[in-house]
Amino acid sequence: MKAGTLTLLIALCLPISVSATTLRLSSEVDLLVLDGKKVSSSLLRGADSIELENGPHQLVFRVEKTIQMPGHGERLYISPPLVASFNTQLISQVNFRLPSLLNEQETAHFDAAPRLELLDGDAMPIPVKLDILAITSVAKPIDYEGEVERYNKSAKRASLPQFATMMADDSTLLSGVSELDAIPPQSQVLTEQRLKYWFKQADPQTRNNFLQWAEKQPSS
């Protein structure tokens, strides 16, 4: 791969307003996993939105809401973990719209057959695939990343296999034989996804060091 081509690929990872989607967070939605990666609660604390790249995305979350009980009591309702997959290719904003969940009858119906809407900035529905994430492990705390990886490999209703692939061991990126050398065609997409993900995790100095390294790589 030519260094110039790699640099262009990396440049695509940088935040660009015209190619970003704003996911508006809801106080009644507890986001657990985003695109195969666990979401840190400290990262979301106080935030009302998340910036996403345009393209396919997958959210794993629970609905948490105080509901009315018979006799004027209240309790906290927590839904089973849900998986929502959708595409933001031509969408600049995503908003949650939950159904009415005011009492035990409504939450019981929601548990049995979850439904919700994702709306764009013009309040138009976004096509979404919704499913319940069945937890296979009894371990505590729940490894949501691992559960989502298994789900995405199982061809379920809201599965996105590309996010299961991204959970694979990335040790080869650090080995003597780089994935950047003689990449077979079927690995091109995976490699690009990994580059984008790890580049965005790095601090500005690390990004700059990587770009300098890329410029020095010989043409293949």
From Swiss-Prot:
The gene is yccT. It holds the Pfam family DUF2057. PANTHER family: UPF0319 PROTEIN YCCT (PTHR38108:SF1). Belongs to the UPF0319 family. It comes from the Bacteria. It comes from Escherichia fergusonii (strain ATCC 35469 / DSM 13698 / CCUG 18766 / IAM 14443 / JCM 21226 / LMG 7866 / NBRC 102419 / NCTC 12128 / CDC 0568-73). Keywords: Signal. Residues 1-20 form the signal peptide. This is UPF0319 protein YccT. InterPro entries: UPF0319 (IPR018635).
